[in-house]
Amino acid sequence: MAGHSKWANIKRHKWAQDAKRSKIFTKHIREITVAARLGGPDPEMNARLRLALDRAFAVNLPKDRADAAIKKGAGLEEAEAYEEIRYEGYGPGGSAIMVDCMTDNRNRTVSEVRHAFSKHGGKMGTDNSVAYLFQERGVLVFAPGTDSDQVLEVALEAGADDLVENDDGSLEVLTTPEAYRGVRDALTEAGLEPEQADVTQRPDLTVQIEGDNAVSTARLIERLEDLDDVQHVYTNADLPAEAYEEG
């Protein structure tokens, strides 16, 4: 199966995350706390907590801070009560955008998200206005030049659904959320280490956005990601790499 270029956007995203490490740590700690509260403190028995820890350690969150977040979530220490909310909307040029938040103040969060959409030429939608365009999938991305035959063989044997070969030569292994952990472990054990791996909301189809709309969409995504209450931003926009460098 063929797909669009992902590599430049992934590298850009990793650079942006590194540049905001302190805020990123706070968001990961919040995710760990909520996961432990909802499913218990044992990552072997709590898939959401295990994924939250994977994400946190991928950006080098210290283990002692992760352990403290688990204790808070499990009720062993006092913790804030966060509510999970999803907002949906449209970017400039008509791309779909979903914004997952954790907040202790719903009014503040919706105001900030709405302002970001409005400022950058987008608009808020209603519940389920764009969610149907995405599926929750495990996605493991490999750099251009990775042996696609080997990745395909190991991934399918471990329970993956598909291998996407992107225009730039990068590879995406797709799994169900349930199969994600086993597929990732099998690939790693075979010496195939993904550059990026996560359970995410993957669009069924992407929308190519160009020119000024692409720059505005990139600014919108970056602004949403920078909001304190926002945990994840998903879009079906296929943006050129230079969109993140302009504006």
From Swiss-Prot:
Gene Ontology terms: biological process: regulation of DNA-templated transcription
InterPro entries: Integrase-like_N (IPR017856), TACO1_YebC-like_2nd/3rd_dom (IPR048300), TACO1_YebC_N (IPR049083), Transcrip_reg_TACO1-like (IPR002876), Transcrip_reg_TACO1-like_dom3 (IPR026564), YebC-like (IPR029072)
Keywords assigned: Cytoplasm, DNA-binding, Transcription, Transcription regulation
Localization, UniProt: Cytoplasm
Protein family per UniProt: Belongs to the TACO1 family.
SUPFAM superfamilies: YebC-like (SSF75625)
Name of protein: Probable transcriptional regulatory protein Hhal_2210
Keyword Signal: no
Domain of life the protein comes from: Bacteria
UniProt main location, coarse: cytoplasm
Matches recorded under HAMAP family: Transcrip_reg_TACO1
Annotated signal sequence range: none
